[in-house]
Design a protein with these regions (language model features):
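Anion-binding alpha/beta catalytic cores of soluble intermediary-metabolism enzymes, centered on
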Residues: 1-277, 281-305
Length: 305
C-alpha cells in the first residue's frame, strides 16, 4: 500500500479548498503549484502576488489572496472579533480586541490567523501553516478561532507512521497512528480519553485504517503497580474506561505494554480475550514524554516515516 498515493487520491476525490498561509516560503509556493497542477485540491495562497511571482513557479489556478488588500478583510475581522468577544488579555487586563478595527489590525499581521478566519467563515475547508512558524504560533489561531469538534474538549495531535518497506511483521499494511506526541504534556484521564477518541477518528478518516486502539502503559492489565503517590497506571485505566464510554463502538482496550498491544503471542499471553491486544494499530501514549520518545525511536531506529 502506497499511503501517500492513496491519500492524494482521496484528496482529489474530495475536491476541497485549502488555505496555505505562508506565501513567503518558497516550499509552500511550490507546493501550491504542484497541488493545483495535479488536481489534489483547490488552493488559496496567502501573500503578495508580486513577491510570490519572484519564486518562478506556475501559479495558474492558484488563488492568491493578499490580506492587506483583500475585500473580505472586514468580514474576517468581524469573525475574529465575535470569536474572541469577552476574552481578556492576561497581561493588560483589557479585552483582547477593543473593537472590530483592532481585530482586523491583528489579523492582517498574522496570516495563519487570517487563514483560520477564512476557514471559520466557511470560505475554505482547511488551512495549513507551520513551514516557517513556530508550533505555538501555528496552533494559536486554531485554538482561538476553530476550536474543537463537538464532544471533544481536548486539542491533541497524532502522527501517522508508515513502515519503511510499506509493510511490517505486525502491521501488514504498514500504517500505525501514535497520539499524542506533541501537544499535551501530562494529560489527565479525561484528556487522555479525548485523545484516544480523536486519534481513532484520524486513523479511520485520514490513515484509512480500522482503528484498534491500545492505551499504553508500563503495565498490562494490572501487571505493574504505581509507586506511592503516583497514578500513572491508574490514570490509563481510568482513561480507558472513559474512552469506552465516550465511543463504545471503538475497538479500544488497555492498559497495555507496547509488546502486548502489537505482538499477538504476547497479547494472548498477557491479555487473553482482548480484541485489541496483539492486534493494535493505533497507540495512545500516557504523556508527551513517552509519545515523543516513542515516535522518534520508530523513525530513527525503525525507519518509519
Amino acid at each position: 500500500m502506497d499511503f501517500v498515493k492513496d491519500l492524494r487520491a482521496k484528496a482529489k476525490a474530495a475536491g476541497k479548498t485549502i488555505v496555505l498561509c505562508e506565501g513567503e516560503d518558497k516550499r509552500v509556493v511550490e507546493a501550491a503549484s504542484v497541488i493545483v497542477k495535479e488536481g489534489i485540491a483547490k488552493i488559496i495562497l496567502l501573500g503578495n502576488a508580486d513577491e510570490i511571482a519572484k519564486f518562478g513557479f506556475d501559479m495558474s489556478g492558484v488563488k492568491i489572496v493578499d490580506p492587506k488588500t483583500d475585500s473580505n478583510a472586514d468580514k474576517y475581522a468581524e469573525v475574529l472579533y465575535k470569536a474572541r468577544e469577552g476574552k481578556i488579555n492576561k497581561k493588560t487586563g483589557l479585552p483582547e480586541y477593543a473593537d472590530v478595527a483592532a481585530a482586523k489590525a491583528a489579523a492582517l499581521k498574522d496570516y495563519t490567523m487570517y487563514g483560520a478566519l477564512i476557514l471559520k467563515a466557511g470560505d475554505a475547508d482547511g488551512f495549513v501553516s507551520g513551514a516557517c512558524h513556530s508550533t505555538a504560533n501555528t496552533l494559536r489561531p486554531g485554538l482561538q478561532v476553530i476550536k474543537t469538534a463537538p464532544g471533544i474538549k481536548t486539542v491533541s495531535s497524532c502522527f501517522i507512521m508508515v513502515a519503511p518497506e510499506g509493510s511490517n511483521k505486525y502491521l501488514p499494511n504498514g500504517i500505525s497512528v501514535f497520539g499524542d506526541c506533541a501537544i499535551n504534556i501530562e494529560p489527565s484521564a479525561e484528556e487522555l480519553a479525548d485523545i484516544a477518541v480523536a486519534t481513532a477518528e484520524t486513523a479511520k478518516k485520514i490513515a484509512g485504517i480500522e482503528p484498534k486502539v491500545a492505551m499504553l502503559s508500563f503495565s498490562t492489565k494490572g501487571s505493574g503497580n504505581d509507586a506511592k503517590g503516583l497514578n500513572t497506571v491508574g490514570k490509563v485505566v481510568e482513561a480507558t474506561n472513559l474512552a469506552k464510554a465516550k465511543a463504545p463502538e471503538l475497538a479500544l482496550d488497555g492498559e497495555f505494554q507496547f509488546d502486548a498491544a502489537i505482538a499477538p503471542e504476547v497479547g494472548e499471553l498477557k491479555a487473553p480475550g482482548s480484541a485489541v491486544a496483539g492486534h493494535a494499530n493505533t497507540f495512545i501514549f500516557p504523556n508527551i514524554n513517552a509519545g515523543n520518545i516513542g515516535y522518534k525511536i520508530a523513525a530513527r531506529m525503525g525507519g518509519w516515516k
